[in-house]
């Protein structure tokens, strides 16, 4: 029997988002063994169950109220939303927040030896894709007629196999396209992972747990995007040093023993510190510059 007091979260069992989702939950302090083949895993320290399923099943599980939360790519979520609307349904859910992983783009690609004069080049062509609804929406907005060839995998081989004239598929680096004699010609949708919640009334204990989880996720993402910086800086150049390091708050300034001309400065910077920035700091007279990763952060 299902325990309705436990928060149920759906995540991808294996694939592009699985490892990042697992790491996110671990850094949020959820102790759970996700290295087995079990489809349902129970957290040891929180009333949370993790359902490990195919990524294209996750939006439906959330929209149908089977699970409370889902970690899913926006491309898969939007495709399912358009699919259900096309069938006359009114799917409901909440996007709690965008996450900082799973970035990709859904793009049109054509054979490298074919001319490209914009989307109109696809008028009357056959296009292979795993995302027919996203493709249709985009080309309908352009007023382009086309034929869709639905494939659930190996979309990039369709032109070479004579199944289609072009493709619409996810692209990360473009290496797979190049290996199959294709080139990316148009981005139609940009996606990242997101956390979604089912519609409807939520038990107070579950909502409190969701709020706690969101706070921790925010802290994890902020920590990833921030660095803890320590240095010695000349007192007369402090304003210039601080201007180079956008931070969440003002830095902590500490006196240096036996040195009236310099201070120790500690701060959290919200911007990645590149070598060029460190060289500029050194040129301003800063020394002993340390840049450290942050494991957890809460403002």
From Swiss-Prot:
This enzyme's EC code(s):
2.4.2.17
What the entry lists under PROSITE patterns is as follows: ATP_P_PHORIBOSYLTR (PS01316)
Listed Gene3D superfamilies: 3.30.70.120, Periplasmic binding protein-like II
Which biological process annotations from GO are given for this protein? L-histidine biosynthetic process
**Cofactor(s) needed by this chain:** Mg(2+)
Described function? Catalyzes the condensation of ATP and 5-phosphoribose 1-diphosphate to form N'-(5'-phosphoribosyl)-ATP (PR-ATP). Has a crucial role in the pathway because the rate of histidine biosynthesis seems to be controlled primarily by regulation of HisG enzymatic activity.
Q: This protein is called what?
A: ATP phosphoribosyltransferase
Q: Which gene encodes it?
A: hisG
